Protein backbone atom coordinates (compact mmCIF):
# COMPACT_ATOMS: atom_id res chain seq x y z
CA UNK A 1 0.00 0.00 0.00
CA UNK A 2 1.41 3.47 -0.88
CA UNK A 3 2.29 6.03 1.75
CA UNK A 4 -0.38 8.51 2.87
CA UNK A 5 0.37 11.97 1.45
CA UNK A 6 0.23 15.08 3.61
CA UNK A 7 -2.69 17.36 2.66
CA UNK A 8 -1.15 20.40 0.91
CA UNK A 9 -3.77 22.86 2.17
CA UNK A 10 -3.42 21.70 5.78
CA UNK A 11 0.38 21.81 5.50
CA UNK A 12 0.19 25.53 4.61
CA UNK A 13 -2.37 26.45 7.28
CA UNK A 14 -1.31 24.57 10.42
CA UNK A 15 1.88 24.31 12.48
CA UNK A 16 2.48 21.59 15.07
CA UNK A 17 4.21 22.66 18.29
CA UNK A 18 6.73 20.58 20.20
CA UNK A 19 4.06 19.51 22.68
CA UNK A 20 1.82 18.34 19.82
CA UNK A 21 -0.68 21.21 19.79
CA UNK A 22 -1.81 22.40 16.36
CA UNK A 23 -1.71 26.16 15.84
CA UNK A 24 -3.53 28.22 13.20
CA UNK A 25 -3.47 31.84 12.09
CA UNK A 26 -6.44 33.93 13.22
CA UNK A 27 -8.80 35.31 10.58
CA UNK A 28 -9.17 39.05 10.02
CA UNK A 29 -5.68 40.26 9.06
CA UNK A 30 -6.02 40.36 5.27
CA UNK A 31 -7.80 43.63 4.54
CA UNK A 32 -9.61 46.65 6.08
CA UNK A 33 -6.71 46.98 8.53
CA UNK A 34 -6.95 50.78 8.65
CA UNK A 35 -10.25 50.59 10.55
CA UNK A 36 -8.87 48.19 13.21
CA UNK A 37 -7.01 49.42 16.28
CA UNK A 38 -3.35 48.56 16.87
CA UNK A 39 -4.38 46.57 19.93
CA UNK A 40 -6.86 44.53 17.88
CA UNK A 41 -4.35 43.93 15.08
CA UNK A 42 -1.73 42.74 17.58
CA UNK A 43 -4.25 40.27 19.05
CA UNK A 44 -5.34 39.04 15.61
CA UNK A 45 -1.72 38.57 14.53
CA UNK A 46 -1.06 35.87 17.15
CA UNK A 47 -1.34 32.17 16.37
CA UNK A 48 -4.26 30.42 18.01
CA UNK A 49 -4.58 26.76 19.06
CA UNK A 50 -6.95 24.68 16.98
CA UNK A 51 -10.26 23.71 18.61
CA UNK A 52 -10.36 20.19 20.09
CA UNK A 53 -13.22 19.27 17.75
CA UNK A 54 -11.02 20.02 14.70
CA UNK A 55 -7.84 18.46 16.11
CA UNK A 56 -8.55 14.86 15.05
CA UNK A 57 -9.25 15.77 11.40
CA UNK A 58 -6.26 18.13 11.20
CA UNK A 59 -3.89 15.48 12.59
CA UNK A 60 -5.11 12.99 9.99
CA UNK A 61 -4.61 15.53 7.17
CA UNK A 62 -1.09 16.24 8.44
CA UNK A 63 -0.30 12.53 8.60
CA UNK A 64 0.21 12.39 12.39
Swiss-Prot record:
* Superkingdom of source: Bacteria
InterPro entries from the xrefs? Ribosomal_bL35, Ribosomal_bL35-like, Ribosomal_bL35_CS, Ribosomal_bL35_sf
**GO biological process: what's one of them?**
translation
- The answer, when asked if 4Fe-4S is one of the entry's keywords, is no
The disulfides recorded in the entry are: none
Alphabetically sorted, this entry's keywords are: Ribonucleoprotein, Ribosomal protein
Hey, which family's this protein in? Belongs to the bacterial ribosomal protein bL35 family.
Q: What is this protein called?
A: Large ribosomal subunit protein bL35
